[in-house]
Design a protein with these regions (language model features):
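N-terminal Lys/Arg-rich, disordered targeting/topogenic segments
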Residues: 1-27
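Hydrophobic membrane-insertion alpha-helices, especially the h-region
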Residues: 27-47
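Substrate-binding cleft of secreted/luminal carbohydrate-active enzymes
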Residues: 41, 45-54, 305-358
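N-terminal, intrinsically disordered, polar/charged segments of Gram-positive cell-envelope systems
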Residues: 50-94
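Active-site-adjacent "subsite" loops/lids of carbohydrate-active enzymes
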Residues: 88-99, 178-230
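Catalytic domains of carbohydrate-active enzymes, especially glycoside hydrolases
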Residues: 110-136, 231-243, 308-317
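Aromatic-lined substrate-binding rim segments of carbohydrate-active enzymes
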Residues: 132-176, 250-285
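Aromatic-lined carbohydrate-recognition surfaces of secreted/lumenal glycan-active proteins
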Residues: 170-180, 240-243, 262-302, 319, ...
Length: 358
């Protein structure tokens, strides 16, 4: 007897029910994922859509081009204007002085090394001798009356000044004014003559090595000194230290100054004021060096044509003697008092190869 077949239809019916439920779940998940994707895409695309809409609105409706540089510049706020820092004004009454030798400026390498050494020592003013009492100029001057005065060995003065400035130092040109035995032989009108003669007045017997001097009353001599000052100023030396602004120490009545001039302090004062004013107008500073004894003397000094107070010096450097006198402190006190009485603005005291403010 055969076994009756099992009815599997009901089982098939249940399978279809379960299958339908799975499809519903999967469909719901798919719709949810699609909705989320739409939101994500919309979120990401929103800036571009807004930009496009804005651009369309302004270009089509308003007639403006947002992509043009002028429009972009107009839409950006102007940057705030910064106030420039004020340029510091150098104080001419601060810092120590050092007197350098020409050998320290014979090459660019030595210039840089010399500047570095003075910088490490805390020096501010570095004095370079560019014209001394021998009459020689230690730079290649182009002045016509300097044709015989340029020394055999010179330095590049402009490069020396630049090297010092790069190190934060102030270059100072040391110049001797009227004690000059060379220039008179180039232009005889510049020298002091004996009264009513064509012979040069000499500061000693010729056999003893007597030398001529430049005449403070000679227009040619005064212009020559002014030319040297102007020349070194143009090379970068804003500070000038001038010595030898005087008459010969042993001048006598036999000296015949140009134009019948006499050895007076008022004439030297006029020259100093003229040079100082010219320098100041061009941003320069003039210092004048005189020996201790000349400044300290209460009596008229022949070389000055009067007393120190008559000269009207604004910035003074007192040169101490090589041999220290017994009454040095007394003389220095008197010199400082004379400078104060004369209303000298700044005073320094030079000893050997350095100087300090007082």
């Amino acid at each position: 007897m055969s076994k009756p077949k099992k009815n599997l239809g009901k089982l098939k019916h249940y399978k279809r029910i379960f299958h339908t439920r799975d499809q519903i779940v999967h469909t719901a998940l798919a719709w949810a994922a699609g909705i989320i994707a739409v939101f994500v895409v919309g979120y990401l695309a929103a800036p571009a859509v807004l930009d496009f809409g804005t651009h369309t609105w302004y270009t089509v409706v308003k007639g403006r081009d947002l992509d043009s540089p002028s429009s972009a510049a107009a839409s950006e706020p102007a940057p705030a204007q910064s106030t420039p820092a004020p340029t510091p004004v150098p104080n001419v009454d601060q810092g120590s002085w050092a007197f350098a030798s020409l050998s320290g400026f014979s090459s660019p390498e030595k210039m840089a090394e010399t500047a570095r050494q003075y910088q490490e020592k805390g020096v501010h003013y570095v004095v370079i001798p560019l014209k001394d009492s021998t009459g020689y100029l230690y730079y290649p001057s182009t002045l016509p009356d300097a044709s015989k005065s340029v020394a055999a060995t010179t330095i590049d003065a402009a490069a020396a000044a630049a090297a010092l400035r790069e190190a934060g130092l102030e270059p100072v040109a040391s110049l001797c004014a009227f004690q000059d035995p060379i220039a008179p032989y180039t232009n005889r009108d510049m020298g002091i003559h004996y009264q009513n003669t064509e012979y040069f007045w000499l500061d000693a017997e010729q056999e003893a090595g007597g030398k001529p001097w430049l005449d403070p009353w000679s227009e040619a001599a005064v212009n020559y000194v002014a030319g040297v000052i102007s020349e070194v100023k143009a090379m970068g030396f804003n500070t000038i230290l001038l010595s030898g602004v005087q008459y010969p120490s042993y001048a006598t009545s036999s000296c015949g100054y140009a134009g019948g001039g006499t050895a007076t302090a008022s004439h030297l004062a006029q020259l100093l004021k003229s040079w100082n004013d010219t320098l100041s107008a061009d941003g320069g500073t003039l210092w004048v060096q005189y020996p201790l004894a000349a400044v300290a003397s209460a009596d008229p000094v022949a070389a000055l044509g009067g007393t120190y107070a008559d000269l009207g010096v604004q910035r003074l450097m007192i040169a101490m003697p090589a041999e220290v006198p017994e009454n040095q402190e007394e003389l220095l006190t008197a010199a400082k008092a004379a400078a104060k009485s004369a209303k000298t603005e700044s005073v320094t005291v030079k000893t050997a190869d350095s100087a300090v403010f007082q």
